[in-house]
Amino acid sequence: MSIKGNIIIGQSGGPTAVINSSLAGAIDAAKDAGVKKIYGMHYGIEGFLNEDIIDLRKHVKNSQDVSLLKRTPSAFLGSCRYKLPKIEGNEEVYEKIFSILEKYDIQYFLYTGGNDSMDTVKMLSDYAAAHGKTQRFMGIPKTIDNDLPVTDHCPGYGSAAKYIATSLKEIIADNDSYGPYRTSAVIVEIMGRHAGWLTAAAALANNSPDLIYLPEVDFDPDDFVKRVGELAKEKNSIVIAVSEGIKLADGRFVCELSGGSDRLDGFGHKQLSGVGAFLASLITEKTGVKARSIEFSTLQRCASHVVSRTDVDEAYNAGYLAAQKAFEGNTGEMITIKVESRRPYLVSYDSFDIHQVANVERKVPLEWIINDGTYVSDEFIEYARPLIMGQIEPYYSAGVPQHISLSKEGKE
């Protein structure tokens, strides 16, 4: 294989516990192929537009650094929520991007992210094709939301699901500790705007929660209160998992009932929060049961101390293959994972046309949502259980996990 030019790798959107494993895979593939310069985008495409570019060989120098990188949460390179404008009418943005690529002799462009990030790969590869450019653009899937199409699942989801299941198991044990002398309810709010994959993972706790609510089905507050009241007659400890994005039949987010924020993120998505606190107040008001809420927030995406080994390995392989595919001439594609067998668990990897991926959202199948929209089926458990298997021990220093971070040297 003849390698011409250099490679650059970027990270975008919400970080995960294994996004750096994909970076490690891409770096190793580039080193194995003999690429001279391995660049990183500091803060994604937004940083790239400002020529904030890193020489990764100066930061990830050896196998020990790679091993530590795979144990480091968040986005090592820094992330962004910058959305590229449409090509038409904004050609100057794309001309600037390609002039920077040419300045650094970059022929291979890898971008790690979710739906909106894959749209960046699509637009750049489309521009290159329309203007006779030779650069290759590949997408590496990354999202704890697990909502990218085509691929069976997304790197990042398995570790987030493992954290959620582990935390639910511990929360249930804590709430059970008071026995018959106090009735209390805990609402656990979990990320998930339109797709409930993360909240569904609560069912992976061996002593799983009493109720699970996903955004795929309409939420009925009156039915919710009735179910909690019935549970309170049967048991003293009630634990409920809810997606932040659950909606009423009229399409409004439940969190809006509490006067939730109207702020938008960089991709134009409404920022959601407060559904757990609202439902806890509703329970206490309507049933008299003491209730409180727990919001996992960013913890569910950065808990590198409880990652899934399966997830780490698959994220690494996705990054490695993305670089290999780019070196072979592929462009405008995203790496995909296909499950060949669930028992024993075996997967294969491929790449797929980015046009069939960008801005397409995959939700939990409705047939996997049971009990009138309050739980998930055994089919979901069968699907998700292998993704959380295995663990990787952190390296410890001074009693806490050791991570790797960008040093001051190595800036271009």
Task: Please report, for each region that a protein language model flagged, where it lies by residue.
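Glycine-rich oxoanion-binding loops at beta->alpha junctions
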Residues: 1, 51-107, 116, 155
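N-terminal phosphate-binding or glycine-rich loops at protein starts, especially the Walker A/P-loop
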Residues: 2-54
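Gly-rich Lys/Arg/Thr-decorated short loops/hinges at beta-loop-alpha junctions or inter-strand turns
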Residues: 3-9, 69-83, 142-152, 182-183, ...
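Short, ordered loop/turn segments at secondary-structure junctions
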Residues: 12-14, 41-47, 81-82, 114-115, ...
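Short glycine/serine/threonine-rich phosphate/pyrophosphate-binding segments
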Residues: 16-26, 48-49, 93-95, 115-123, ...
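Accessory alpha-helical/coil subdomains and C-terminal extensions
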Residues: 38, 108-113, 119-138, 154-292
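C-terminal non-catalytic interaction/assembly regions of soluble proteins
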Residues: 256-259, 263-412
